[in-house]
């Protein structure tokens, strides 16, 4: 069985790890980095992922996607999506099913389809390291992701050619990474996870009993639309406002200028974690009739902190709720772990430290801990990691809509998963022949205040007065936190059941079509690589042949020279095209035409060697010295 890899699919950066022996190892990508920017660019000719996509973002802002995780599993009309529509340089559109999609080069794409490009790069990184195909993965998601966001993440995995063996919550993965080597007894750990686009807090009990380590999530809370991107946006707004005050020009309608501003704001924010002042300097940011305009703004750490103070404060309320849900006080928490790049900000660290009244752990890498935890969980699933039990929870309550538009909960939030629950309901009207089961997720009493996960009908109920039929509704949450619902008429035994997907979401057919599309592109990529190799070999052959013609000089007969030059011309023409077979054929023909050159070079080398060697040695030459001569000639060519 192949390795199961662990992937942290992040808003800003992604990371892949694998169990190497008994330790989880973070893998370096093709660029030599341990994390990969979660940026995807469509150039019209190819798809770029990671650092190559980031490098060209300024010149291709409308077709370069970042923070796509903020859209995954969301509806276009959601408030969070509408906020992003106004500030993103790329186009966010409403799909036919109501989902939030994106558009590049007039092609509409679902967020799982775009995210799959990042997962494919993670998959390739692991395959390059392991030297074998990878088909299975554990992928992390924010703990506060709802059912449709989790399902969309699994869809992204399928499109990338991965069977997602488990969806695991990011704070839980970080706790696994932190606690796997620590064998002490009962320990309450708070994992504060502030990433690029999401925020989670999980209270986790790590216990060691009879050699088995148990990681039990006691409570989780968070905000799936709060993260480093929001911090960046505050600084971007400030810089744009300052420029408008000074120059009287609005940069917000210029995607190119806004992309440059975004890069500069992110860089300034990072710098201000280690220095108290920085300067944002963007020459030629725009121009008007009077000439080019430059943006030069000094930003202090204090200014940045004042811009984002309310965002930091917003993270503290979920901490209070999570502690209350776990029935714990601040003093019960033994360790505080910070995860996510945004936790490097001194203001964030100070506020969290003050809230818990203790020093924060410094031995956890905020960028890599989640991927390491995912790899550990992959090891648990494959049987490579023994004596570890992970007990996660569902982050939000689940229930159905009942009479009066009320949400009746069947499974409360922070219930350990996998879990099952059932409840018996009845009809609201006399002789009602069918009931609609409307499945909801959230904490509000009024059904409209919660997330609709989907609905289905149970038909064929025998006529009876209202309140008489007995309809059992059963909820079953699997280890990925994904919900399966069934409804059964107890009298007739008629049943209806579904695996809940979002009321929109991608259908199986759409996912399969995207998988086929991804596979087709993989074939295209492989063919393109073969074509480039053939071109490089042909170019190399032409270059070497020209050099040998020059060296041969008058020794090469005019007839042979003409034949070789004709063959070279054919290669140069073939290289301009895209026919790999034609390039290889013309290269082979050039090799055959150049045989006279090889003879001349060999004779010349033998003559030179004969002059250098003593006469007796020259007479005693052995037949296999031809091989030495050829090697000698190659070295000589290199030196020239």
From Swiss-Prot:
Induction of the gene: By stress conditions e.g. heat shock.
Modified positions (Phosphothreonine) in chain numbering: 198
Keyword Chaperone part of the UniProt annotation: yes
Keyword field: ATP-binding, Chaperone, Nucleotide-binding, Phosphoprotein, Stress response
Disulfide bond residue pairs: none
UniProt biased composition (Low complexity): 601-621
GO MF annotations, alphabetized: ATP binding; ATP-dependent protein folding chaperone; unfolded protein binding
Keyword ATP-binding: yes
Region Disordered, annotated ranges: 601-640
InterPro entries, per the entry: ATPase_NBD, Chaperone_DnaK, Heat_shock_70_CS, HSP70_C_sf, HSP70_peptide-bd_sf, Hsp_70_fam
Record's signal peptide: none
Chain intervals with Acidic residues compositional bias: 626-640
Family: Belongs to the heat shock protein 70 family.
Biological role: Acts as a chaperone.
Protein name, entry field: Chaperone protein DnaK
Source organism of the structure: Shewanella woodyi (strain ATCC 51908 / MS32)
